[in-house]
Amino acid sequence: MSEGIKDQPGLSEAAAQSRASVLRSRAESYIALSRHDAAIADLTESIALMPGNARAWRLRGESHRVLDRHEAALDDFDEALKLEPDSAYALGSRGQTYAAMDRLEEAMADFEHALTLSPDSLWILEAKADALADLDRLDEALEEHSRIIRLDEDLAYSWVARGDLYQRMHLYQEAIDDYTKALEAEQDHVRALSRRGEALRMADRYEEALADLSRALELDPGNDRALGSRGAVLSELGDNEEALKDLDRAIELDPDYIWAYRVRGEILQELERHEEAVSDFTQALRLEFGD
């Protein structure tokens, strides 16, 4: 009899296995509903009943990861991998946890191992690309994003992800082209519209940028980044009052939006509202540098 079942003397081994299985299944539905604390409670009982089930450890680790409980997640993924050393899912999830903790070399080791087991796993490839970008290995990250697109050219998200990397590399036309591909796959993809609008702004194509950002905000009125970008575009087009409305709303939605404070401060300075400008620049410095 397993140690877990010994802890539940009122249950036969068959009953304990059955209860543990149902708890795992219910936990998966809780996870799908983003009810991660409820999932963790079920999985903790399931593990107590059947500690040798790798899936239960992995699922609980994933819930801990989503809740940013990184140390607990690592402990669970380690246990899952003791039981199933070649679980690409557990390796990929542990890699994501390491990446969130800025332990990027360990993350890369897990992603590389996972991809030897599941070479075409899009989410693991995506996580590896993100880690490479965080390591400032941008050309390698770009290769991974291109590989993802080759595997499935119909996924809007994959085009957006590569577009974001191009934008980070200041390759704005390439970014615009990728966001356009994303929008061909999914015409109302809010992030693609918002990010293409930002790339167009950086390319000084303000009217086109305004159209994209306004469409993004029709679809998602609370998109603080689209509001910030549109505010900057409106200012470039000479409409500072409307620009300030967008930036006010962006900061209301995200009081820690450093870039929006900087842009609003510059507009206020242009309008000779210097006390307000000083306040915004001071807030930007406080948020970014702790002044």
Regions inferred by a protein language model and the residue ranges of each:
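Alpha-helical tetratricopeptide repeat
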Residues: 1-291
